[in-house]
A protein has these predicted regions:
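Short, glycine-biased loop/turn motifs at secondary-structure junctions and
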Residues: 1-213
Length: 213
């Protein structure tokens, strides 16, 4: 079985686990090569990166990536790597890996597994699958993090519902979890967020959120 056939078989397996097979899965079943499959992934990206198929990608894609890499990269999709010149078209999938994955420029990164991710430039990181994701945001990056741990620096922006550490000129919107702030530009906290900060300056609280000095 070729790597493409392995991925397509995984699609079949995911589809069988879903009572009403979503349009994204049905579209993948019709693909005949990796280029067509990558086009479907782009069209239905939220289903791919956030749905049941994400778990199968995390488990099976790394082994097949070496063979599929050239065609996937041509479609702007990378696995556990990112080119330094990365326009918004670039998507980075991060699976379970022991290597540090660095994301550059304007790439959009989707963390599916246990990994260390460092983001630079104006890149964006989305993590909603793994509690063992460790993410560092630098420069002008953006993070939308509902699973994992985050350290945010420089002028990065962050939406979070987990435990985060913010420094420098970071803007943080927290919906639960904890915010540990040394320095920051602005913090807006809602839900039951706990904000650990030596100052109350530029901190807005909603709901049951509170500051712990």
């Amino acid at each position: 079985m070729t790597p493409f056939e392995t991925l397509k078989a995984a699609c079949h397996a995911a589809c069988r686990q879903i009572p009403a097979c979503a349009p994204s899965y049905r579209a993948m079943l019709k693909t005949e090569n990796i280029s067509q499959m990558m086009a479907v992934w782009r069209e239905y990206w939220e289903d791919i990166a956030g749905g049941k198929y994400a778990d199968i990608i995390n488990d099976r894609l790394p082994a097949a990536y070496h063979t599929l890499r050239k065609e996937m990269n041509a479609a702007g999709i990378y696995v556990n790597e990112c080119p330094k010149m990365a326009p918004e078209f670039v998507r980075v999938i991060v699976t379970d890996t022991n290597s540090v994955v660095q994301v550059f420029d304007y790439a959009k990164c989707y963390v599916l597994g246990a990994a260390n991710v460092w983001a630079w430039g104006h890149s964006q990181v989305y993590s909603e699958k793994s509690d063992d994701a460790y993410i560092i945001l630098k420069q002008h990056t953006y993070g939308h993090i509902s699973k994992g741990h985050v350290l945010a620096y420089d002028s990065s922006r962050l939406w979070s519902s987990v435990r985060v550490w913010v420094h420098d000129n970071v803007t943080c919107e927290a919906h639960g979890g904890e915010v540990h702030a040394s320095r920051y530009h602005k913090i807006e906290a809602s839900g039951d967020t706990k904000v650990y900060s030596p100052s109350i300056r530029n901190i807005t609280l909603h709901g049951n959120a509170r500051i712990i000095e």
